[in-house]
A protein has these predicted regions:
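Intrinsically disordered, low-complexity, hydrophilic segments
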Residues: 1-69
Length: 69
């Protein structure tokens, strides 16, 4: 997984993140600013899911995306 590309294209990616994890606020997404660690933490906070599960969910989500860099 090349998370650096996600960080570099965060403005385009955050809409897809919001579709998947609708409990994340626009402020959350701005704070995350492409950081995977921040994304994991916010998802864990908003959904009350264990960190390992969050990591798997992000990996699954990432693998399903079609990126148009």
């Amino acid at each position: 997984m090349d998370w650096n590309r996600v960080e570099g294209n965060w403005k385009q990616v955050k809409g897809k993140v919001k579709e998947q994890w609708g409990k994340l606020t626009d402020d959350d997404l701005d704070q995350i600013s492409g950081s995977r660690e921040q994304l994991e933490g916010k998802i864990q906070e908003r959904y009350g899911i264990e960190r390992d599960r969050v990591r798997r969910d992000i990996d699954d989500w990432y693998g399903r995306q079609t990126w148009n860099w």
